[in-house]
């Protein structure tokens, strides 16, 4: 059994997920949910020596301190990322923190290399695209037209998978849709064995969280096309580095994307049973998205925008329906963490594999529409189509939440 108390000691080093990557961090405070108090190291400044680990008496949260409600009921840690400004210090749960050991350091390097390769691949594709255009090759519109001609053959092979796929086992996993806290990190890849336990439901019992933190999850692997991985990495950079947030409501919402996918693929299906399975899969994704958005699909900078939407919906006395407001990039974030959601359920392995197969078929379809849904530049606009800049005032409030 892993000794979590020793692995995540006050003042000690750890690794934590932020975005699709892992970073070295220092534990400044530890929250005890049973006493509703936290302990901290004296003068918990980022530059302070980790050797000075003499604990002070437990303290209550101050008026200017807060812990995300999604993780406050479990043990969590206030960490400082090495080399980062203190404004990025934040509370994280067992879902994002990892022990500082050789295995996790290797995982950190592997994720960094994957992100670099994805970025490199995207740049090479963009260069080839520009070269083709300059030599009189087909324009983007021409390429999309060509893609649509081959759409039939791809959709046909895609549709066949629905003939044998079923998401009947998903019902047992719907409770996991409420999982994970706001600002949880997102991966650019979901095919790394042993790191699919990164974000788990804070609604789970502390004991279950301990098990999740100490043991690897089942090896459920999702093959995300390299171009879509690049989209996730770019998305992370837009929000965390460029301080941008997605324009809302999105021009093309999650509901519109899934409705179009269901409509196009269902035309290739002859069996009513297959069409029913397709409808159930799309309905399940919509359900997961609405339940998961506020808990696991938003970066820290996006929380304020989400809270403002909640306040507006409350004022208008209308329920907030995320699938009608958020767009394809947030749907792709959900897809990237589906293996973790699935592996936290009681679904049998065969049902998990069938659901993953359906999702990979959906990713193939998304790849064919990548320019339509993930192009951050709209020729009809002078500004960014998917992302907007935030003001310094917004950033200050959002990062202080």
From Swiss-Prot:
Its main location: nucleus. This is Chromatin modification-related protein EAF3. Residues 13-98 form the Tudor-knot domain. Component of the NuA4 histone acetyltransferase complex composed of at least ACT1, ARP4, YAF9, VID21, SWC4, EAF3, EAF5, EAF6, EAF7, EPL1, ESA1, TRA1 and YNG2. The keyword Phosphoprotein applies. It comes from Saccharomyces cerevisiae (strain ATCC 204508 / S288c) (Baker's yeast). Residues 39-53 have a biased composition (Polar residues). InterPro entries: Chromo-like_dom_sf, Chromo/chromo_shadow_dom, MRG, MRG_C_sf, MRG_dom, MSL3_chromo-like. GO terms for molecular function: histone reader activity; methylated histone binding. GO terms for biological process: DNA repair; DNA replication-dependent chromatin assembly; DNA-templated transcription; negative regulation of antisense RNA transcription; negative regulation of DNA-templated transcription; negative regulation of transcription by RNA polymerase II; nucleosome assembly; nucleosome disassembly. PANTHER family: MORTALITY FACTOR 4-LIKE PROTEIN, MSL COMPLEX SUBUNIT 3. Residues 54-63, 117-126 have a biased composition (Basic and acidic residues).
């Amino acid at each position: 059994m892993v000794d979590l108390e020793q692995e995540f000691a006050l003042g000690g080093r750890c690794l934590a997920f932020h975005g699709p990557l892992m970073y070295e961090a220092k534990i400044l405070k530890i929250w005890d949910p049973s006493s509703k108090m936290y302990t901290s190291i004296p003068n918990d400044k980022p530059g302070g020596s980790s050797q000075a680990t003499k604990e002070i008496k437990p303290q209550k949260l101050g008026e200017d301190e807060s812990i995300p409600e999604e993780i406050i009921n479990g043990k969590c840690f206030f960490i400082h990322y090495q080399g980062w400004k203190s404004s990025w210090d934040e509370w994280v749960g067992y879902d994002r923190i990892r022990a500082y050991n050789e295995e996790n350091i290797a995982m950190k390097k592997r994720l960094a290399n994957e992100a670099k390769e994805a970025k490199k691949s995207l740049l090479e594709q963009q260069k080839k695209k520009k070269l083709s255009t300059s030599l009189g090759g087909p324009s983007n519109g021409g390429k999309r037209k060509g893609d649509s001609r081959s759409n039939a053959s791809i959709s046909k092979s895609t549709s066949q998978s629905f003939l044998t796929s079923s998401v009947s086992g998903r019902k047992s996993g719907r409770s996991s849709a409420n999982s994970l806290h706001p600002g949880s990190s997102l991966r650019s890849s979901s095919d790394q064995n042993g790191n699919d336990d990164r974000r788990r439901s804070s609604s789970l019992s502390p004991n279950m969280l301990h098990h999740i933190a100490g043991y690897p999850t089942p090896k459920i692997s999702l093959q995300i096309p390299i171009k879509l991985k690049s989209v996730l990495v770019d998305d992370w950079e837009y929000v965390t580095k460029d301080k941008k947030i997605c324009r809302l409501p999105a021009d093309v919402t999650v509901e519109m994307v899934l409705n179009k996918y269901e409509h196009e693929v269902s035309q290739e299906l002859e069996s009513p049973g297959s069409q029913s399975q397709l409808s159930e899969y799309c309905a399940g994704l919509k359900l997961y998205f609405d339940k998961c958005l506020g808990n696991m699909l938003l970066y820290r900078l996006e929380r304020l925008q989400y809270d403002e939407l909640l306040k507006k919906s409350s004022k208008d006395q209308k329920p907030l329906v995320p699938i009608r407001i958020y767009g394809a990039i947030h749907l792709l974030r959900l897809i990237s963490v589906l293996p973790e959601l699935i592996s936290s359920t009681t679904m049998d392995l065969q049902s998990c594999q069938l659901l993953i197969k359906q999702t990979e078929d959906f990713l193939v379809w998304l790849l064919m529409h990548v320019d339509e849904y993930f192009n951050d530049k709209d020729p009809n606009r002078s500004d960014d189509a998917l992302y907007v800049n935030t003001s310094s005032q917004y950033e200050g409030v959002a990062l202080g939440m």
